[in-house]
């Protein structure tokens, strides 16, 4: 049972497609992949073609966010080694790597949850305190985060108006009618009807709708930078595409910058302007989307890309046959 179509292509003999509890169609894998009969199935198969257009950003003298030679540890265990990155206003920087590569630790360092043992974090050219508890309310407001699992990020007992309204009150001082009016605007921005959703609780929403609420809550603080930590990994591919399109539209409207933490190559290919590749806590590759995806690849980057499952039943067999003992990497078995 999965929403990952590429995994289905490798593992299944037959495929059953469901929509809202009803069977859409059932067939053997080869037939389903090559010639789906129903429109819904065809739409599922087509989602991996989404791409944003490269942005022509204005020349900027300094990055919005900069990490300089940052190192960090959990106790005696080092997790980041000499990590540097730059992110500009209105730009999307994707940080990609396998599990344990340091992606989420980088996000924790930026947000002040993981103090660096060396190096510094600069925001708009000014050093940020290493510990979030030492940061001003204004510094906290400017950097917001959208988490991987909305069910753990949203208070199940609160109404949507309270969830989105809290940062409006905390950061901007909005209360009462002014707060509710702004919540309604934010719901419209994420394409949810305020009249329907404002008084609901998270348990009454679908997974995609919950993630949109998380987006609205982040936007409520009026941030300049949003860190997106695996924001589509818990969603089926059709819903995930809708979330990526929404984030792209919001960026075009507001000029917000995104730091995308992901292990999904398709997401990077779809939305990134710049790409940072991490392995074992180090940056091993960096460049524009075009540069990173144009061969020849750096060795580890090439291994990551070749490990991206394809909607082809023979893909895994071909991949395993192509990997010799000299070029295989056991650490990528989970990718």
State what each model feature region is.
Residues 23-27, 35, 283-287, 295:
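ABC ATPase "signature
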Residues 222:
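Conserved catalytic motifs of ABC-family nucleotide-binding domains
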Residues 8-10, 268-270:
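A short, surface-exposed alpha-helical micro-motif characterized by mixed small hydrophobic
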Residues 111:
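Helix-to-loop junction immediately C-terminal to a conserved catalytic motif
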Residues 201-205, 209:
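Conserved ABC ATPase signature
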Residues 119-130, 139:
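Conserved ABC transporter NBD signature motif
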């Amino acid at each position: 049972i999965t929403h990952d179509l590429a995994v289905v292509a490798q593992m299944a003999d037959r495929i059953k497609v469901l929509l809202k509890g009803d069977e859409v169609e059932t067939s053997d894998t080869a037939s389903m992949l090559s010639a789906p009969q129903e429109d819904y199935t065809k739409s599922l198969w087509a989602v991996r073609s989404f791409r944003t257009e490269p942005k022509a950003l204005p020349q900027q003298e300094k990055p919005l966010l900069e990490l300089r030679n940052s190192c960090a540890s959990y106790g005696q265990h080092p997790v980041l080694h000499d990590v540097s990155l730059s992110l500009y206003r209105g730009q999307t920087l994707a940080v990609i790597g396998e599990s344990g590569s340091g992606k989420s630790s980088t996000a924790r360092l930026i947000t002040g949850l993981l103090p660096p043992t060396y190096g510094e974090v600069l925001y708009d050219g000014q050093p940020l305190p290493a510990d979030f508890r030492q940061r001003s309310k204004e510094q906290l407001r400017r950097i917001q985060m959208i988490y991987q699992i909305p069910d753990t990020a949203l208070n199940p007992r609160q109404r949507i108006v309270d969830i989105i309204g809290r940062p409006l009150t905390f950061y901007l001082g909005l209360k009462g009618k002014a707060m509710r009016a702004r919540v309604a605007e934010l719901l419209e921005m994420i394409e949810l009807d305020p009249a329907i959703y404002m008084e609901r609780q998270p348990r009454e929403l679908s997974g995609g709708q919950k993630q949109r609420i998380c987006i609205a809550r982040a936007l409520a603080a009026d941030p300049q930078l949003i860190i997106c930590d695996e924001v589509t990994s818990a969603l089926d591919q059709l819903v995930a595409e809708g979330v990526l399109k929404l984030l792209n539209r919001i960026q075009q409207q507001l000029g917000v910058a995104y730091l995308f933490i992901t292990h999904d190559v398709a997401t990077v290919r779809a939305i990134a302007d710049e790409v940072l590749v991490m392995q074992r806590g180090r940056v091993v590759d960096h460049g524009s989307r075009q540069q990173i995806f144009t061969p020849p690849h750096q060795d580890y980057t090439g291994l990551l890309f070749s490990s991206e499952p394809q909607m082809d039943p023979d893909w895994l067999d071909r991949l395993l046959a192509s990997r010799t003992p000299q070029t295989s990497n056991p650490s990528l078995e989970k990718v």
